[in-house]
Design a protein with these regions (language model features):
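Signal-transmission linkers at sensory-effector interfaces
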Residues: 1-41, 52, 72-74, 154, ...
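Short, hydrophobic-rich beta-strand element in sensory/regulatory alpha-beta domains
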Residues: 47-51, 57-65, 71, 95-96, ...
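Amphipathic coiled-coil signal-relay and dimerization helices
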Residues: 68-77, 85, 106-108
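Short beta-strand-to-loop transition segments that serve as allosteric relay/switch motifs
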Residues: 79, 156-166
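Acidic/proline- and glycine-rich, intrinsically disordered low-complexity segments
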Residues: 82-112
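Signal-transducing coupling segments at domain and membrane junctions
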Residues: 110-139
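A short, aliphatic-rich beta-strand micro-motif
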Residues: 138-149
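Allosteric cytosolic regulatory segments
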Residues: 173, 177-185
């Protein structure tokens, strides 16, 4: 019994260490995003770091298109094509569904139709992208990027495939929510006139959305 208790305590300690390391890494990433005036260039630099943070293979960040009915990829890791992906805001794709429902999804296997239908009867994975690239997507962690003061949808962050083949953890789920909030602030700053950025940021700090 003592051996079992010791084993459980050791496991809990290791889990706490992993969680702390993850949160420290996440804070470093968010600090860099807050400090930049060029979010597009920074995210290209940070894409590998974000993948490392989530122990993931690939990352895609979408922004809402000018038509407000679609999302367009702005950052893509692991794809040789430079052409942006444009997806309708609908259940026709997982990222599109997240944009439509504004919900966070942690999918264990995108090819499991039963899992997708348990989320939404119309939800499907765009297998055509895998066929075109030769890549096999399995796990997917996806979150909407929403400007909290206005409740405006700004984009979607999508993280693909854990390197160990396991589902994304609960810590990763919490982390992608924090990352999406940080990206929302960065997107808002990019879309505002220079003179309004400081006021916008101060408003968020005052409302405890972010810490200075």
């Amino acid at each position: 019994m003592n051996d079992t208790l010791d084993s459980q305590l050791t496991q809990n300690a290791k889990e706490s260490e992993r969680r702390l390391a993850f949160l420290k890494h996440l804070q470093m990433v968010t600090n860099r995003i807050h400090a930049t005036s060029d979010i597009d260039e920074l995210m290209l630099e940070l894409s590998e770091d974000v993948c490392g943070l989530f122990n993931a293979e690939r990352l895609t960040i979408y922004a809402v298109g000018e038509d407000k009915a679609s999302i367009v990829s702005k950052v893509k890791t692991g794809l040789s094509t430079q052409k942006n992906l444009r997806l309708p805001i609908s259940a026709q794709s997982i990222a599109g569904h997240v944009a439509l429902s504004r919900s966070v999804l942690n999918i264990h296997d995108v090819y499991d139709d039963a899992e997708l239908k348990s989320i939404s009867p119309d939800l499907r994975f765009l297998k055509e992208v895998d066929k075109r690239t030769g890549y096999r997507t399995k796990q997917m962690l996806v979150a909407p990027v929403i400007d909290l003061p206005s409740n405006e949808l700004l984009g979607v962050v999508q993280i693909l495939n854990t390197k160990d083949g396991k589902p994304f953890s609960e810590v990763a789920l919490e982390g992608v929510k924090s990352l999406s909030e940080t990206l929302a602030i960065a997107f808002s700053q990019r879309n505002k006139p220079v003179g309004l950025i400081k006021t916008k940021y101060d408003f968020l700090v005052a409302d405890a959305v972010v810490s200075a």
